[in-house]
Amino acid sequence: MKMLPLRAAIAAALLSVAVGVAAKPLVVCTEASPEGFDMVQYTTAVTADAVAETIFNRLADFKPGTTEVIPALADSWDISEDGLSYTFHLRKGVKFHTTDYFKPTRDMNADDVVWSFQRQLDPNHPWHKLSSVGFPYFESMGFKELLKSVEKVDDNTVKFTLTRREAPFLADIAMAFSSIYSAEYADQLLKANKAGDLNNKPVGTGPFVFQRYNKDAQVRFKANPDYFRGKPPADALILAIATDNNVRLQKLKANECQVALYPKPDDIPSIKKDEKLKVDEMNAMTVSYIAMNTSHKYMSDVRVRKAIDIAFDKAAYVNALFGKGNATVAVNPYPDTLLGYNHKLTNPPRDLDKARALLKEAGVPEGTTFTLFTRNGGGPTNPNPMLGAQMMQADLAKVGIKIDIRVMEWGEMLKRAKNGEHDMVSAGWAGDNGDPDNFLTPMLSCEAAKNGENYARWCNEKFQTLIDEARAKVNPTERAALYEQAQEVFNQDQPWISMAHTRMFTAMRNNVEGYHISPLTTNNFATTQVK
């Protein structure tokens, strides 16, 4: 007669233990809203964190905290001797998310891989014209010209045939624009005349399943119980959007979030002194820059661009925004840790008299006004956008140039910059794959000028030829020599003011474990948990 109460007591005890060790939700304070959830339509790191790193996977991936390419949805691959064919062998048993709006009937297979690339490659594909903005990253990277075909060999094998050798191809395949979608889900949406849901109700194979998005407030996910690398330790992931880095820090201290992305560099010492907090940091592959719209009056003249460059005090800018040791003044469009960095190039000295002379020679009337677009909140490449804009405004006033500062929400700024509405725009880039091509082709190529990702609207044939040749070279020494020449052309023609290469910081509560800061500035929380 005592057995039933004993069993009940044991059951209650087990339930108590289970409740006690239940995984806690992870709340991450992030700096901006994602542009959308159809990853291939967008290019920003904010969107990649909220979409590519949570919802989707790719054939290959980067080992956490490094730029080493490792298997992901493909568990192996073969490369032909001529370097023109890549055959990917897919991992078996990978499942797409089951949601209230999609119930997959099969595992991920070659049809999904082919669909994901053909949609971007083939103008006759039924989904190709449904993207209102095209496929900016795919196009800027030159993949339209690079990919000859993407073919299904069998259910678990896909063959990519290239038109030329491409040294960074495997690294490119690990990037956000190469995310793999469910062809079955896409077919379901097309038949139901709900194509827009691909961008609003995403489905992938990634560590987290999308639940809902409250614009400019938060994105909510739940852990994927079927994730091929194992269910994430956090039962839920919440991205809490706070554009002000001071607000993100306040929320972290109040335990309203357990991770705060991109704190201000000058807040780092006080964060490190707080017993309840800790900081992860490393040198990042970034560049912050001012792009000058070479399609606009006056800005099309290299003398004007040179004048603006030598009138602006970049050293003062870096010191004011980043503090000592947290960033270096940039010379070239990518940092010196990457292949082919040209160490022979230097910044010209600041020279207001020469700047005035160049402006006069170019016929720019004193008092001419240029617009400068900047964002309303700080991020990894620009922790204090308004201060930086005001410093430029003050410096250029000394040479007779007025700056009309236009502060706007991140997504709005990108949209208007892509449309070419700016004279200048304060922007930044974080390398996606550890290769110099990832800085030069997406932001400075002629193709990127056409689709608006090249905010300078700069298309230089000599520069284009050099970076095209470099991509096709396998020998690192030969590639490096070509990149050094490309940087010389860039500096001679001055489409940007290269501002800074930064150090990356992430602040978190002491009870957060399993987070890996990345030199690529991506944030993946598949292994992160709150203890």
Tell where the protein language model's regions lie, with residue ranges.
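Structural transition elements
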Residues: 208, 299, 328-362, 379-387
